[in-house]
Amino acid sequence: MKTKKNLFTAIVTIVLIGTYTISACAQTKNGIGRIELQRHDISTLGREMVQAHIDFEPGTAFGNHNHPGEEIIYVLEGELEYIVEGKSPVVLKKGEVLFIPAGTIHSAKNVGNSKASELATYIVEKGKPLVQLIK
């Protein structure tokens, strides 16, 4: 009986690790990797919180886009340049933060020589796409 339980535990563990790995890999495109860490309803009706870890390889950029709500960025490592509509470009390093108002067009680029990462927290309208690309 103990052997069956151990086998079951091993299979479940392998499936979960495989699912996480596939999910993480599926979110990598053009040198930018995105892993959604959590998504929860909040006390404001029709809104939710989404948190993601985003990696940028050196020289990669995520072009103009916006979100259906506020974004708070915390730089985990590296140097990221943010261009926010109506403001001068700003370069943030590890430990620095940036607030982006709802619907504001912005872009991000890794301007350093190594990988850069950010923790992005969004308070957005539930049911709407998290990112809208702007041409």
Walk through the language-model features, giving the residues of each.
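Short acidic-glycine-tyrosine-enriched beta hairpin
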Residues: 56, 86-103
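A short, N-terminal "cap"/entry segment at the start of jelly-roll beta-barrel domains
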Residues: 3-50, 83, 99, 129-135
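Short, conserved beta-strand element in jelly-roll/cupin
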Residues: 55, 67-82
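Histidine-centered metal-chelating micro-motifs
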Residues: 61-63, 81, 98, 102-109
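Mature N-terminal segment immediately following signal peptide/propeptide cleavage
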Residues: 42-64, 73
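Short histidine-centered beta-strand/loop micro-motifs
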Residues: 62-67, 84, 109-111, 133
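Extracellular/periplasmic catalytic domains that process cell-envelope and extracellular macromolecules
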Residues: 46, 66-67, 74, 91, ...
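Ligand-binding loop in jelly-roll beta-barrel domains
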Residues: 89, 104-127
